[in-house]
Regions:
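Structural recognition of the beta-strand scaffold that forms the well-ordered cores
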Residues: 29-33, 40-41, 96-99, 120-122, ...
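Substrate-binding rim/cap in mid-to-C-terminal beta-strand-loop elements of soluble/periplasmic
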Residues: 118-124, 300-347
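Acidic, His- and aromatic-enriched active-site or binding-groove loops in soluble protein domains
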Residues: 123-136, 176-214, 218
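Non-catalytic, well-ordered alpha-helical segments in soluble enzyme domains
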Residues: 144, 151, 328-365
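Active-site His/acidic residue clusters
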Residues: 172-174, 220-266
Length: 371
């Protein structure tokens, strides 16, 4: 174990191993990402500095935007922006990363943009070779590929994402994972009436970005997969929060964050309605990187933009204590997410990948003591 992560394990006072499968209620894990959604919006809601045309580039009238997303306190603002996160998830799980309360979460890849972040998140360790979003096929197997190689999970692992680069991040040629990403039409063969409409939208909609399909377009085939294929390990990547920030449209950042929260709620409700998922599913919700925080800096991210390394992580499921917003706890890092996904399924990812960071053990056991 490297010294870089060893102190985290000691502070959490639990072994950095997969939990015994017999002691866990979780049988399904969903890792959900909203690309580039800042911790500031997660914990404080709409940013007053950006609720205007000058800094936030808003096209909506300021009065209308304030009516929808502005409230007197950070707690009220975050709840109106992200109601599912701050009602259901906060009541049933844990939310980490509020720096104002001594809860720190950050990346360790040294770049603070998407491909290096997803590699760190999904493989459990950073890779300095991955220094571009155009890097190409990932040389590092992800925890999803590893889990798909286990007999009990083979063929029960899927990826749905708006960004076409996920086909490289998950290296589909090597992993053979089903990765639905970008503008590839989601259906094949005989289509239902609803599927035919969505297929036409995929093929005929004007693309603001050739690499990113709209979040809403992803949601329908995602929900179909839940009903039809009984996926047990699922990755879901939404992208509009990052895209609209790069476009300098803070009003649409807020709208897309609000819709992201709705999509997560919709996915949770759909899974809880299925007997195979009900009360046996854990959600891990996070982001790949932060952003800057000034009147111009919020649009961008990268190691040169201070604050881009800061992220947030939320966890909800049958094996996570309902502690809500965490405060004054040890720092967690993005690399710990991979082993955490595996640990909820009773698997020790670090035994197979010693370079991986340990799981976030404090979210793994209702019986563990301390806060």
């Amino acid at each position: 174990m490297s010294m870089k992560y060893g102190w985290l394990v000691l502070l959490f006072a639990l072994p950095a191993l997969g939990a015994p499968a017999g002691s866990l209620q979780t049988r399904n894990v969903v890792l959900i990402v909203s690309d580039g959604l800042r911790w500031q919006e997660i914990f404080s809601g709409a940013d007053p500095l950006l609720m205007n045309e000058k800094n936030g580039g808003i096209w909506a009238t300021e009065a209308d935007l304030r009516k929808k997303f502005w409230r007197a306190t950070p707690e009220e603002r975050r709840k109106v922006l992200l109601p599912f996160l701050w009602t259901t998830v906060a009541a049933r799980g844990q939310i980490l990363g509020n720096q104002t309360k001594g809860s720190l979460a950050h990346v360790t890849n040294g770049f603070a943009f998407s491909y290096p972040g997803y590699n760190e998140m999904l493989t459990g360790h950073p890779d300095r070779r991955i220094d571009s979003n155009e890097f190409g096929p990932n040389p590092n197997p992800t925890v999803f590929e590893w889990l798909n190689g286990l007999p009990d999970l083979h063929g029960r692992v899927s990826v749905f994402a708006t960004w076409s680069t996920f086909k490289d991040i998950f290296n589909v040629a090597r992993s053979q994972l089903p990765v639905h990403a970008g503008w590839d039409p989601p259906y094949a063969g005989q289509l239902t009436a609803e599927q035919a409409i969505l297929d036409r939208l995929y093929r005929t909609t004007t693309k603001l970005d050739d690499d990113d399909v709209y979040d809403a377009f992803l949601q329908i085939p995602l929900l179909d997969a839940i009903h039809k294929h009984q996926v047990r390990v699922l990755f879901v990547g939404y992208g509009e929060t990052d895209n609209w920030a790069h476009s300098g449209r803070y009003d649409l950042v807020l709208e897309s964050a609000h819709l992201f929260d709705h999509f997560v709620e919709e996915l949770w409700s759909a899974m809880q309605a299925e007997p195979a998922y009900r009360d046996h599913t854990t959600f891990i919700i996070t982001t790949d990187h932060g952003r800057g925080s000034g009147p111009l800096e919020w649009k961008e991210h990268g190691i040169e933009e201070r604050g881009s390394e800061n992220i947030w992580i939320a966890v909800m499921g049958p094996d996570t204590r309902p502690l809500g917003e965490r405060a004054h706890i040890p720092t967690v890092v993005q690399a710990q997410i991979a082993a955490t996904v595996a640990a909820f399924l009773g698997e020790d990812y670090r035994r197979a990948v010693p370079a991986a960071a340990p799981p976030i053990t404090d979210v793994l056991s209702r019986a563990s003591a301390g806060d």
